[in-house]
Amino acid sequence: MNFIKEFREFAMRGNVVDMAVGVIIGSAFGKIVSSLVSDIFMPVLGILTGGIDFKDMKFVLAQAQGDVPAVTLNYGLFIQNVIDFIIIAFAIFMMIKVINKVRKPEEKKPVPKAETLLTEIRDLLKNK
């Protein structure tokens, strides 16, 4: 019973719940960006590059033989995934910049009175 109680306390901490929400939102955001790249950007890029479909760009290492499919290096899909990553990384970078601007800077803690007095005493002793 103690184990369940400890787990519940751990799971309900603010950091864990915030992280879980962030992972879910990040996953959904990733799907949106992937769709944006594959359904909007890549077709336009394909038209600009002469009608090339990046999904079909590949090197054939071994031809298909009977029921065995061809062995390929799908570099077109890799290019598409790199573009996905760049867009996601840029969007996260921009969100962090906005969050850091909005976040209030930490207030400087006042110097404890004892430390101030000791500093003054030290300075007075130096001047003697």
Swiss-Prot record:
Its main location: membrane. InterPro entries: Mechanosensitive_channel_CS, MS_channel, MSC/AndL, MscL_channel. The keyword Metal-binding does not apply. This is Large-conductance mechanosensitive channel. Channel that opens in response to stretch forces in the membrane lipid bilayer. May participate in the regulation of osmotic pressure changes within the cell. Keywords: Cell inner membrane, Cell membrane, Ion channel, Ion transport, Membrane, Transmembrane, Transmembrane helix, Transport. The lineage of its organism: Bacteria, Pseudomonadati, Pseudomonadota, Gammaproteobacteria, Pasteurellales. It comes from Haemophilus influenzae (strain PittEE). It is a multi-pass membrane protein.
